[in-house]
């Protein structure tokens, strides 16, 4: 059953009145920039298969978003990174698939060479002025932020 709570219809238990609030999916990404080059991964899965994006994935229950960012970088690129700070937070309206909230961190590479893994089939650094076909509005927005900060 549903009932109106806080101005919206919410699923609620008819017996005890417990209201179920649907949590958004949260994605976390990492942007690594070195010597005017940005780390990107080519997506091996849909959506946007074959296009390039930042290493990213879903936040696991109970996981710190900064840890998610570092974990995704390691899983998708083989690189160990340190998180330097929050770059931006993006909102993706419901119904478009993927994460509703996307948290993007800036990071620095500590060790390793880019080697694709997990749901990426390639990983490498690209000059900011010679980027491949990018996936997702958040990837394009992140690149724009980096370009603006280096101008």
Where are these regions (language model features)?
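Conserved Nudix-box catalytic region and its N-terminal flanking loop in Nudix hydrolases
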Residues: 33-75
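Unchanged
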Residues: 59-83, 89-147
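Acidic, metal-coordinating catalytic segment for phosphate/diphosphate chemistry
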Residues: 1-30
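A generic structural signal for short beta-strands and their flanking turns/coil linkers
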Residues: 9, 26-28, 48-50, 79-85, ...
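Conserved hydrophobic/aromatic beta-strand scaffold that supports enzyme active sites
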Residues: 10, 31, 40, 104-106, ...
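A short Gly-Trp-Pro
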Residues: 20, 34, 55, 104-106
